Each structure stands twice: as structure tokens, then as C-alpha cells.
Amino acid sequence: MRLHHLLLALLFLVLSAWSGFTQGVGNPVSCVRNKGICVPIRCPGSMKQIGTCVGRAVKCCRKK
């Protein structure tokens, strides 16, 4: 029975860690860590959007 609890805890750990990799950039701190800048409108032509900074209105942009 203890083995089942251990395996269940390991499964939750793996699934919670995996969800972090699929989120992308979602706040200003992670934007800067990913070498991006927060832009209140759309990204300029020489940059691509890698996420959002605050809500959906402010984009996180990085050079292509």
C-alpha cells in the first residue's frame, strides 16, 4: 500500500512539473528571463511574440 502512495505522489510530481513547461511566458519576470520585453501593443516587425506580460493586452516580444 505504501508503494501505491509513493507512485501516486511521483505521478503528481511529474504531471505538475510537466504543466510548467507548457505554460510559456505569462508574467513580466518570466518575460525578462527569456530575454524579452513587454510591449503594450503588438510586437514590432523585427520581433516575435513569445507570450504575454499582464493579461492578454501586453505582449512579451523577443528578437527573431
From Swiss-Prot:
An example Gene Ontology molecular-function term: CCR6 chemokine receptor binding
SMART domains xref list: DEFSN (SM00048)
One cellular component term from this protein's GO annotations in UniProt: extracellular space
Annotated disulfide bonds: 31-60, 38-53, 43-61
Alphabetically ordered keywords of this record: Antibiotic, Antimicrobial, Defensin, Disulfide bond, Secreted, Signal
Signal peptide: 1-26
SUPFAM superfamilies linked to this entry: Defensin-like
Tissue: Tracheal epithelium.
GO BP terms: cell chemotaxis; defense response to bacterium
Main location class: secreted
Pfam families xrefs: Defensin_beta
Protein localization: Secreted
Family label: Belongs to the beta-defensin family. LAP/TAP subfamily.
Described function: Has antibacterial activity in vitro against Escherichia coli, Staphylococcus aureus, Klebsiella pneumonia, and Pseudomonas aeruginosa. In addition, the peptide is active against Candida albicans, indicating a broad spectrum of activity.
Record-given protein name: Tracheal antimicrobial peptide
